[in-house]
Design a protein with these regions (language model features):
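Metalloprotease/metallohydrolase-associated module, dominated by Zn2+-dependent proteases
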Residues: 2-65, 78, 107-172
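Short charge-dense sequence patches
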Residues: 37-41, 91-97
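Short pre-active-site segment immediately N-terminal to the catalytic Zn-binding motif
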Residues: 64-67, 73-89, 100, 133
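Catalytic Zn2+-binding segment of zinc metalloproteases
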Residues: 93-111
């Protein structure tokens, strides 16, 4: 599939404070989760489209973990990040953009869709995709960088792909 779309830059600074308040509860949950998992020293990542705090899980722990965006916090397993690099970060930053729109409803909405995808997957599996991603529109359709770029390589290339990575501050 690999239908990527370049995200629009967040230009309007007037709404920045409103966006911060709107996204703060979920982002605070993300920071607390990262700390509880033993993550330290977050790195600020992102570009014109959005930004987030990147936490790496402690080496050797939580090996089954992959990556999750909780508000404007991204928690990744280092080996998974090394394997998928900037497209993984672009996908997770795309979730941060979803969070800008949905605010405190983001986590419950995503949880419901993860559950429904898992139920649908039990009746009709999709090769290369996990149960929680296969039928989840927040993972595959309503997102700038769908999980397909990670689950079904090779990742996109060309001018469009570079413009998407540039919008997320992930070039060179």
């Amino acid at each position: 599939m690999n239908r990527i779309s370049p995200p629009a830059a967040r230009r309007n600074r007037a709404f920045g404070a409103i966006r911060w308040v709107w996204t703060a509860p979920t982002t605070l949950i993300g920071h607390a989760t990262a700390r509880l998992l033993g993550c330290r020293n977050p790195q600020r990542i992102g570009g014109q489209a959005t930004n987030a705090w990147l936490f790496r899980l402690p080496a050797g722990r939580f090996k089954g973990w992959r990556a999750v965006a909780i508000g404007h916090v991204i928690i990744v397993e280092p080996a998974f990040l090394a394997e998928h690099g900037r497209w993984l970060l672009a996908h997770e930053l795309s979730h941060a953009r979803q969070h800008d729109w949905l605010g405190p409803t983001y986590l419950p909405a995503h949880a419901v869709l993860l559950f429904l995808s898992t139920v649908m997957f039990s009746f009709r599996p999709v090769a290369k995709f996990s149960p929680w991603h296969a039928y989840n529109p927040m993972e595959r359709v309503l997102i700038c960088v769908p999980v397909d770029v990670i689950a079904d390589p090779p990742p996109p290339q060309g001018a469009l792909a570079e413009s998407v990575l540039r919008a997320f501050g992930l070039t060179g």
